[in-house]
Swiss-Prot record:
The lineage of its organism: Bacteria, Pseudomonadati, Pseudomonadota, Betaproteobacteria, Burkholderiales. It catalyses: L-homoserine + ATP = O-phospho-L-homoserine + ADP + H(+). The keyword Transmembrane helix does not apply. Pfam families: APH. This is Homoserine kinase. Belongs to the pseudomonas-type ThrB family. It comes from Burkholderia vietnamiensis (strain G4 / LMG 22486).
Length: 332
């Protein structure tokens, strides 16, 4: 989350007239990320996040905001969009769609342990099942068609070895996506970007027997209807890796995957294609980071991510991928 669109005090005062959130006490930009303009907003009624959507259109936005409301109604801890005085969940600010959502409690855990991965795995499975009856449809906009469209623009900037990997993996993924097994994979609304910095943890209540409590998932603006296994792969590729090498941490990966399976067991097709999907998850973020690194947009506050991180992860997943762990327990 970065700041591409500035909001002055007078802009904010005019905007807040459409909400019943009391008086503004504090307002500041959030510098991390690369997609939308985000601001922390504190009022006499509580703490919120204001987002100006730089790419998503007014036609696309209801999928994301309504999904968050749907998940919140199913007791999945996510930010809840705040209705305006006309009942709408978003309006226009500087001609761009914008919304206010509740701010979750807690802080990101950037050095997660096994206990954090257990919490994330269970909640991710709960989120997938909670989304089964969500009515709106929106594909993952950063999936295969987006890769095919944008890889040619990246190629002039990279080495021959990187180009060979980028193009060979694109061909591999295109064949996988066209297969009958891929079509049979369970699907539904997915977060598609569940990195460490998009999950909050709070201290667990005394006497619960737990050291950590998951505060919630946020930043759903890359969400889309996709294969659930893709969502799991994206999550594992961030939560369960050695950041220097991209190698999977077996203890954390097993903890997350076993916890997920206690809520939703994996199918036979998912087990067969775990390696392919881990590669897909790594490829998606390698492509997007290459694009953002070499073809950036101007922004007031912008911190581009290192594309090499996901190149290392992709090469590692091609070389080594353990099977999904077995489990014999399921609950809801």
């Amino acid at each position: 989350m970065a700041v591409f669109t500035a909001v002055s005090d007078s802009d904010l005062a005019q905007w807040m007239r459409h909400y019943e959130l009391g008086d503004v006490l504090a307002f500041r930009g959030i510098p991390s990320g690369i997609e939308n303009s985000n601001f922390f907003l504190t009022t006499t009624r509580g703490e919120y996040v204001l987002t100006i959507f730089e790419k998503l259109t007014a036609e696309q936005l209801p999928f994301y905001l309504d999904l968050m409301r749907h998940l919140a109604s199913h007791r999945v801890p996510v930010p809840d969009p705040v209705p305006r005085d006309d009942g709408a969940l978003f309006g226009l600010l500087h001609g761009k769609p914008a919304a206010i959502v509740t701010k979750l409690d807690g802080a990101a855990e950037l050095a997660p342990g096994v206990e954090h991965c257990i919490e994330v795995g269970q909640m991710l499975a709960r989120m997938h099942l909670a989304g089964r009856d969500y009515a709106r449809q929106q594909p993952n906009l950063r999936s295969l068609p987006w890769w095919q469209e944008n890889v040619p623009a990246i190629v002039p900037f990279i080495s021959d070895a990187q180009r060979a990997l980028l193009e060979s993996e694109l061909a591999h993924q295109a064949a996988f996506f066209a297969s009958d097994d891929y079509a049979a994979l369970p699907s539904g609304p997915c977060h598609c970007d569940l990195f460490r910095d998009n999950v909050l943890f709070a201290h667990a209540a005394p006497g619960t027997g737990h050291d950590v409590r998951l505060g919630g998932f946020f930043d759903f603006y890359f969400a889309g209807c996709d294969k659930w296994l893709f969502d799991v792969a994206v999550t594992v590729n961030d939560w369960c890796v050695d950041l220097a090498t991209g190698v999977l941490d077996t203890a954390r990966a097993d903890a997350l995957l076993r916890a997920y399976q206690t809520v939703r067991p994996f199918t036979a097709e998912e087990r067969r294609h775990w390696s392919d999907m881990l590669r897909a998850g790594a490829y998606r973020f390698w492509v997007s980071r290459l694009y953002d690194f070499y073809l950036p947009r101007a922004a007031e506050m912008l911190k581009p991510h290192d594309p090499g991180h996901f190149e290392r992860i992709l090469r590692e997943r091609i070389a080594h991928t353990p099977a999904l762990p077995e489990t014999h327990t399921a609950c809801n």
